[in-house]
């Protein structure tokens, strides 16, 4: 058999190995669990030292400890019932996720942006808005 007949098979095998070796971007499961529980203290463990919060009518950069208080107040006003990640991906050293936070007072769309700091993947942005985008 001629070598040129094997070339397409070899290319197919190499491409398959490359696809298997690439892991899909995943937000740490502990972050989803913390949102589902409405646990601001647990979320803080995965935050950068400064984080941008956009929560309904509030938008600012906060130090980690202040961000925890802001999120605690949000969860007091909107007790969490469930959190489901709808989409996630990655680009360069950043990962993102879009999820739905179900609360006792309605559903919210959550955007998360995580970036690598050293070897850790840390939350740099949390945006929570009403499900219809208003």
Regions found by a protein language model. Give the residues of each.
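Bacterial Sec-dependent N-terminal signal peptides
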Residues: 1-25
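Hydrophobic residues embedded in beta-strands of well-ordered beta-sheets
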Residues: 51, 93-95, 121
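Short, aromatic-enriched amphipathic alpha-helices that serve as compact interaction elements
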Residues: 23-39
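A mature extracytoplasmic/lumenal domain signature
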Residues: 47-50, 57-59, 87-89, 100-103, ...
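Surface-exposed, charged secondary-structure patches
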Residues: 69-107
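Short solvent-exposed beta->alpha transition segments
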Residues: 26, 47-84
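Short beta-strand edge/turn micro-motifs at domain boundaries
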Residues: 107-134
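Solenoid-repeat scaffolds in large eukaryotic assemblies
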Residues: 42-44
